[in-house]
């Protein structure tokens, strides 16, 4: 399954569209900042399932800051990361992911890309967009 993971778009929808056109994903995950960008992307590509979580700039969102989902038989914990203080390091977020049985932790907020693996557990941050 091809999944496009985006985060911290901050109003820049055009680069997200370019990513969708390039990757041709079967699902899109948006990790917050800004949820309205994800909504716009969902309207542009209504046939592609889109899941998201709010970030620290998504004021007034009623959505939960963390979302556990399963795609292609893989359990993924999605979060923006600000509530787990990921700018100080991903350890608290990693602990939360392991506690809920996730295979992959996806987070944003830091604007720094990260791909790390510990055994069969993956930690990933797409950076910005």
Please report, for each region that a protein language model flagged, where it lies by residue.
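Short secondary-structure boundary/capping segments
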Residues: 20, 42, 66-70, 96-97, ...
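Helix-adjacent hinge/juxtasegments
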Residues: 49-100
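Conserved beta-sheet core of the metallophosphoesterase superfamily
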Residues: 48-51, 85-129
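N-terminal active-site segment of His-dependent metallophosphoesterases
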Residues: 1-48, 58-65
């Amino acid at each position: 399954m091809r999944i496009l993971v985006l985060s911290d778009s901050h109003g820049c929808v055009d680069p997200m569209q370019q990513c969708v056109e390039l990757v041709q994903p079967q699902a899109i995950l948006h990790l917050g900042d800004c949820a309205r960008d994800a909504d716009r992307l969902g309207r542009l590509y209504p046939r592609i399932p889109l899941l998201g979580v709010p970030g620290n700039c998504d004021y007034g969102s009623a959505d939960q800051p963390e979302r556990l989902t399963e795609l292609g038989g893989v359990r993924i914990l999605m979060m923006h990361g600000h509530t787990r203080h990921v700018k100080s390091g991903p350890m608290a977020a990693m602990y939360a992911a392991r506690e809920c049985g996730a295979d992959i932790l996806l987070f944003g907020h830091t604007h720094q890309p990260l791909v790390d693996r510990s055994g069969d557990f993956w930690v990933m941050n797409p950076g910005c967009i």
